[in-house]
Amino acid sequence: MQSKLKFLAGLLLLGGAGVASLGAETVPASAQQAPAASRVVLLGTGGGPIARIGRSQPANLLQVGGKTYLIDIGDGMPRQLVRAGVPLNAVDAVFLTHLHFDHTAGVMGFLALDWQARRREPVHFYGPPGTRALVMDTLRALGSGEAIFRPQLPDLPAMASVFFGKDWDVTTPREVYRDGAVTVRAVENSHYGTMHLDPGEHGVNRSYSYRFDMADRVVVFTGDTGPSVAVEQLARGADVLVSEIIDIDAIIAGLKRRQQATGVDQQPLIDHMVQEHLTPENVGRMAAAAGVKTLVLTHFATPPGKEDFDSAAMLAAIRKHFSGRVVFGEDLGAI
């Protein structure tokens, strides 16, 4: 436990309220930690497909047992990974929760830069239907650049021979991945509950939450979701729940201003924000129902142009239901 706390060099305890803010401090992957212990780094903690000053787009790093995994690849992830002390070609597998831009916009940069960093071993992208098409389409888009670099890098394998995508069609909770370091379970969450999306060529669009069971602890990533019994059950007894959170009052106020300015009905988007994201109270309810030990907040969804939020009010709402440890995540914070 003490070795894990060394990663929290930037930790700021707020007034005994049980909230910790992870400092945006670069923590080298080679920091003193037992090889068997797991390490989670929040590479990007911003919410929504919005370019922000203080927070990168959603992405998480998990390292355990000599393996390196990514959960989502928002824009800017390659730089964030290097800032966390991890080379791109150390990545063994990628798990995408869903295919919204803020969770996938870094895929092109990762493929290009990882290949040029002398990627030799295959890396697989796993996720909902459409994941395989995303990887293949991105490789096609990079084809011209690959051809230009090929004379200078004749020893590198074809990009299509080292990057692969695999779709998981998860309709009931199940194990989706296992190796010597982790067992991964997935559930379909409620993020697309009101959207009534037509199936694409790849099938039905879905959004997942993931549970990683490891020798030292259990970590669950909600991805984007609203209240969900399936996610509560997935997270039951977890050591760490990494959860999205939304500043719902600020979001609704911004959407109403947009409607007044444009005349375009924003109610469908308001319904999505209310029902398919997690307010502070709903985060607290989920963490309490699941009986998790530590709640880590990320994917802070605020309106465009507004990056601050009332952390005290958020905490008070969470504390109505959850009495465990609460961490307000920052980019590059390690857990």
Where are these regions (language model features)?
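Bacterial N-terminal signal peptides that target proteins for export
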Residues: 1-18
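Residue-level micro-sites within transmembrane alpha helices that shape
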Residues: 3-5, 102, 243
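Cap/insert and terminal regions of metallo-dependent hydrolase folds
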Residues: 205-209, 215-220, 226-329
